[in-house]
Each structure stands twice: as C-alpha cells, then as structure tokens.
C-alpha cells in the first residue's frame, strides 16, 4: 500500500519547510509529508546561501509563520543594507557610504540557514508533518485527473512511492517539474557569484580603523549587523553576519565585466580577485580558511509557469531566481507559498478555478518577477557611480515599500483584482523607464560622490512609506493608497529625469531650473530623438508642484544648499542626537526596546492615517472608526 497524503512537498529547504509550516498553521487538518535527501543535523553556517531578509520576507517569517520570538532569540537582527563606493585602493573610511544609522520599526533579520532549517524541521515534525529524510526524489508523476500524484523516491537502495493530492516542487535549482514540463525560461541576466563562510566575526568596521571617532559615530548601531556591500563597476562583495558566529562572504559580478572564470574556480582565485579589486576586504579575509566554497555561473532564470489548477506548484528556486542584491529570494518564497496555500484551501473547498490560477501565474511571473528583474539586469554598470546608485537605491526602495511589500502585507496576493493588475502595470511601466534612465545615465556621466554618508531614513517620503507598512487596510483602501503613492513616484521620476538631463544633456535643460516643465514620466529617456514620438511633452496627468519631493535627494547630487541644511539636515542631525550621538548606549537600549520590539503605531499615527479619503470616510473620520474593539483616527495615505 503506497502511503498517501493531502500535500507532498519535495524538498526540505527554506521554501519547502516554511510551506509545510504555513499549511499546518492555516489548514491543520491536512496530512503533509516533506521529503529531502539530507538528514539532520544540517551544518550551521556552511550550508546554503540566502541569509539576508527584507521587509516582505520578514513579515512572512515573523507574522504569517509566527516565528518572531524564534527569530529574536535564535537569529540576528539586520541593520538594513549598507553600501561602500569609490576608490577601493584608498582609505576605506574615505569611501562614500550609503546606509542607515538605526534599526527601523519593522524588523528584518540575518538568517543562519543551517540553524534555521534544522530548527524548522523540528518545528514542523512537532506540528504533525512527516519529515522523510535521507531520501532522494527520483521522479514526479502527475495525474491527469482527480487521482493522486505519485512521487517515486529512493533511500539507500530501497525504492518506494508516495501519493499526494497536491505535490510541490521545492527541490531548488534541480527544477524537477519545470524540466519535466518544459517550463524553464532564461531571462538574459548574465551574472555569476562565488561565496564562502568564515568561522569568525569579520567586521567591516575594522576596515575603517583609521577613520577615527567621527567615522565610527556617524552610524549609531553596529555596521557589522548590516548586509554590507563593497561596490564597484560590474560587481559587489557582501559581508553578512550569522548567528553561529560565522560570517558569509561573497563576490557577485556581471559576466560581461568580471567573468566568472576570473574568481569563481577556487577560494584561492577568489582571494586573488579580492586583492586586486577590494584590497581592504582581502586584508580582512586572507588569514582564514573557509568552512565551504560555493559558486554559480549565470545564476538567474525564470519560468513559464509555477502554479497549476491540476494541483501542483513550484516554490523557491524550483521556480525562479533573479539576483541576490536586494535579497528577493525569500520574498518570492513568501508570495509563492502563500499563493500555494490559497490554492490548496480553495481546492479542498471545491472553489479552485483555472482562471484564478492563471491570475496567480500572471501576478508572480508576468508582473512581480518581470518587474523585479529590471532592478538588476544591465544595472551592474551603475555600481561604480555612488550618486546614481544612491538615487537608484532610494527609487528601488520606494517602489518596493509603496507597492510590492504592500501587496503581501495587505494580503492582496491571495485575491488580486483587475484593479490590482492595472495598477501593477502602471508601476511596472514607470519603473521600466526609470531603470533604463539610470543605466543610460551611468553610461554618460562621470562617477562622483558629493556625500560622505547618505542615509535613506532622512528622506521623508521613504520614512512615510516605511511607517505605512505597519497599517492594515481593506482592499479598496490599499488601492487608493497605491494610487497616491504612484502619484508621488511620478514626481520623483520627473526629478530624476531632469537631474540626468542636467548631467548628461545640459544643453537641453530649461533656462529656469526653479520651474521645470511637467513631462510624461512614462516617456522619459536620455534619447532626445524619441521625446516627440514617445509624447514626453504630452503628459496625461495634471501638473503638480515638484517642490515637496525635491528634498528627497538633498545632498545626493550636490552639497546641500543653506535651505536644505536648515530644512533637511538640521532636523536629521537633531534626530540623530536625540537617538544616539549624545549617549549611544542608552539610546540603543531605548530604541531597541521602545521602538524595534513594538509596532510603534503611536509613532506612525503622528504622520499617517490608516485609510484613504472618500466622502463616507471623511464623515466617519469626524466620529472615529471602530475596528476590532479599538477606535482609530481617520484615513488617508501619505
């Protein structure tokens, strides 16, 4: 008799284990088995890459999977992303730095994958999931009708078959189902990587040892806990701390600029490459033997389909992988797993339709993945331009917080409407124009860095978007706020366009720079020959003042004016003083315990209301809206 389950998950990596936990939490009556070739204990540190999370994945791990306490106790907090630009052969402390000074109110984490996956296996087993270890999945035979699918397995020399109503491919880059069904899809993002783990704390702060107290103090928390990036044209090098005490180090390159063959064959070759391009990193690493050494050439790929109404899906790297720069891997796991659970739920309720599954594939593959690839594809040439990459990073974060993360936080991914698809397409089209603008800008403008340290938390628009992730909204409220955010991003795109024109085509700048023409942001480019045919000067939106958004990039493109110093820099400096410059140990304690470990909605309500405005909402605001036993004030976006 072949054992039969409601859900068979092939692969007990991060995607498979988190899916098993999510199914058990949301659909506890279902029987689940997880199959993996590796048996416990898995090695800590030297196990798998993919250690850093951003807000969407952190929400998934912490809130959806109910792992906040575990992550606080067994993993490390993440102090955002940090980038170092400029002359890699000069003094490290003189390199322009982009990174936050304090933890945000929404936690993110540095994950030791070996520790996490060991712990998750134990957790799901205790929840009633059957964890079948030391077992290889040979084939997946999909049923043509309502019969169970069959998974043919092998343990040692013994072969056996398992049956499941649902089967999930979480086998990683093996991509068993995608290969079987002809669903693999290249995406022409030619990038490669090599990485290793060192069994010691490697602190980038030690590279700036000659920077003195001022360099050390400008970041209140410990740089060590950031995902640290050393940036150069066509490459970046990462340093990520792990809870086991080890440090993950990696080299990632554009194949057309730094071929994999120049660094990826061995640890010795990688060290030689570091010595040539990032000597400060080489000095930090050279005395250690690695716990492991891994590499991937041309790591990026897509898929034609990852969900099916015939009761299968591909999650994690079994479906797609884009690029590690902004740690999107766990974000896609969160979205794919949540959609998979929704499909399973509807199936057992008799409500799953082929049309709904088509929408899920369209959402992830045609919109989210297609648009996210634009952050990385052909963009590695920008990394040598501190001011352009800083502008790009702020833009990327704004798009992510304004729409992508909100899709998940507001649970829209489970039931995307036509209006959601329409809005996503508008975001995607605008993002495509701006990303190409950055690429062309970097190709035409000289590299420069008007700043010593930039911190996106000084950008008020981004502050509002980040705080806004703490609000919970209805579907209509989500749509209205997403539209308002799109308006703000349209204004940012106009400012970026005119800055690029000023640097690359100064003869095209209007005489009066204080009143820039309002253009069609969906038609911007650095090719004047296309402006007429693309309708650059025929915007479909009414002119709005750009002044409120102008200070977003204060100090990034040029030293701050006196007005900006008073209006932007002075409040930021006072804010820093109140949170760390004067008494760093006390402020760190208060910040972590009063802000980071709590939703901090009291702080958010100082800036943002919780729902958008409509006539009915406006009337309700006067009296307050009662939700869940609490009275909350008002509505509106940013």
Positions of predicted regions on the chain:
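Redox-cofactor binding/interface segments in oxidoreductases and associated redox assembly factors
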Residues: 10, 169, 314
């Amino acid at each position: 008799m072949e054992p039969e389950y409601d859900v068979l998950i092939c692969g007990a990596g991060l995607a498979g284990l988190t899916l098993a936990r999510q199914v058990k939490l949301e659909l506890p009556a279902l029987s689940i088995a997880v199959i993996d070739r590796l048996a416990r204990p898995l090695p800590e540190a030297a196990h798998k890459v993919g250690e850093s999370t951003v807000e969407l994945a952190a929400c998934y791990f912490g809130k959806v999977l109910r792992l906040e306490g575990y992550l606080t106790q067994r993993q490390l907090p993440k102090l955002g992303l940090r980038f170092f630009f400029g002359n890699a052969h000069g003094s490290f402390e003189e390199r322009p730095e982009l990174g936050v000074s304090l933890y945000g109110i929404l936690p993110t984490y540095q994950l030791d994958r070996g520790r996490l996956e060991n712990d998750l296996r134990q957790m799901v087993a205790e929840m009633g999931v059957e964890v079948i270890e030391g077992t290889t999945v040979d084939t997946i035979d999909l049923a043509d009708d309502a019969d169970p699918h069959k998974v043919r397995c092998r343990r040692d020399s013994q072969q056996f078959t398992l049956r499941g109503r649902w089967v999930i491919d979480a086998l990683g880059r093996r991509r068993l189902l995608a290969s079987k069904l002809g669903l693999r899809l290249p995406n022409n993002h030619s990038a490669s990587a090599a990485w290793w783990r060192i069994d010691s704390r490697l602190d980038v702060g030690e590279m700036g040892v000659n920077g003195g107290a001022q360099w050390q103090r400008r970041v209140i928390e410990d740089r060590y806990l950031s995902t640290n990036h050393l940036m150069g044209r066509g490459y970046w090098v990462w340093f990520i701390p792990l809870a086991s005490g080890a440090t993950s180090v990696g080299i990632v390159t554009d194949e057309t600029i730094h071929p994999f063959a120049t660094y990826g064959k061995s640890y010795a070759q990688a060290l030689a490459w570091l010595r040539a391009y990032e000597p400060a990193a080489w000095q930090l690493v050279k005395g250690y033997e690695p716990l492991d050494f891994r590499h991937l050439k041309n790591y990026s790929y897509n898929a034609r389909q990852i969900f099916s109404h015939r009761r299968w899906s591909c999650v994690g790297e079994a479906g797609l992988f884009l690029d590690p720069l902004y740690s999107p891997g766990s974000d896609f796991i969160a979205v794919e797993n949540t959609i998979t659970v929704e499909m399973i739920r509807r199936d057992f309720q008799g409500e799953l339709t082929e049309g709904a599954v088509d929408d899920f594939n369209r959402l992830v593959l045609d919109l989210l993945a297609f648009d996210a690839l634009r952050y990385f594809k052909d963009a590695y040439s920008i990394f040598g331009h501190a001011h352009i990459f800083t502008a790009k990073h702020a833009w990327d974060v704004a798009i992510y917080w304004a729409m992508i993360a909100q899709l998940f936080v507001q649970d829209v991914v489970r039931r995307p409407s036509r209006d959601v698809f329409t809005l996503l397409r508008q975001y995607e089209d605008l993002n495509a124009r701006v990303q190409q603008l950055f690429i062309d800008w970097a190709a035409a403008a000289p590299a420069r860095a008007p700043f010593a340290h930039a911190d996106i938390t000084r950008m008020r628009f981004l502050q509002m978007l980040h705080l806004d992730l703490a609000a919970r909204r209805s579907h209509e409220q989500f749509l209205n706020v997403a539209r308002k955010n799109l308006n703000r991003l349209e204004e940012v795109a106009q400012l970026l366009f005119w800055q690029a024109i000023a640097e690359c085509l100064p003869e095209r700048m209007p005489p009066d720079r204080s009143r820039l023409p309002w253009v069609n942001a969906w038609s911007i480019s650095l090719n004047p020959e296309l402006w007429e045919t693309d309708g650059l000067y025929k915007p479909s939106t009414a002119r709005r003042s750009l002044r409120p958004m102008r200070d977003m990039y204060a100090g990034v493109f040029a030293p701050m004016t006196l007005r900006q110093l008073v209006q932007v820099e002075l409040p930021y400096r006072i804010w820093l003083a109140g949170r760390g410059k004067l008494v760093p140990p006390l402020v760190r304690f208060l910040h972590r315990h009063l802000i980071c470990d709590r939703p901090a909605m009291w702080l958010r309500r100082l800036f943002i209301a919780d729902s958008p405005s409509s006539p009915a909402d406006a009337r309700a605001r006067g009296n307050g809206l009662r939700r869940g036993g609490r009275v909350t004030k008002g509505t509106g976006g940013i």
